[in-house]
Design a protein with these regions (language model features):
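Structured binding/interaction patches within domain cores
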Residues: 1-164
Length: 164
């Protein structure tokens, strides 16, 4: 059974919980890269300087966890105030990564993308253009970041998925 098949067999709440767990485990990769300082970069379109807050990924994880725990009748407020505001913080950096305006080590980039995809999943659910669930993509990216960053090996990930 492939990783995707195993993850697809889980209920949605378990998939999201697994994605959050892996992303929290990968957070030291991001923190090691930022070392508590904003990431600065210049975009190639208008040569404007941008900053990424060093706590952006931690705030994203916390906001998603708060959103999940919120009573159903308050989730729309959580969505509007917390998650959608965070999503706008990802817009410019995602474009700049795709335009190669900034180059990060692969584990850092994967951790950043995993946070973005989990946030998008939490806001609107859905799939990628090639049919993968956004939450699966986030899990896969976080797991890849953990492996490439030397934090977790494949067999440990398999055990973690089985425990979920």
């Amino acid at each position: 059974m492939t990783l995707e098949d195993r993850i697809e067999s889980l209920p949605d709440a378990c998939r999201t919980a697994l994605a959050l767990r892996l992303l929290r485990m990968a957070l030291p990769i991001w923190d090691g890269h930022t070392q508590g300082h904003p990431v600065r970069y210049r975009d190639s379109v208008v040569a404007m300087e941008h900053r990424i807050a060093p706590d952006m990924l931690a705030r994203t994880i916390d906001a998603i966890e708060r959103h999940i725990r919120a009573p159903w009748f308050l989730r729309w407020l959580s969505l509007r105030i917390g998650l959608m505001r965070l999503a706008t913080e990802f817009d410019d950096p995602i474009v700049s990564l795709q335009d190669l305006d900034m180059e990060w080590p692969e584990p850092v980039k994967l951790t950043f993308y995993a946070a973005h995809n989990l946030l998008e999943h939490s806001i609107k659910g859905g799939h990628t253009y090639d049919g993968h669930r956004l939450v699966y993509v986030s899990i896969n990216q976080a797991a890849d970041a953990l492996e490439r960053g030397g934090i977790m090996e494949t067999h440990e990930l398999d055990m973690l998925v089985r425990e979920t």
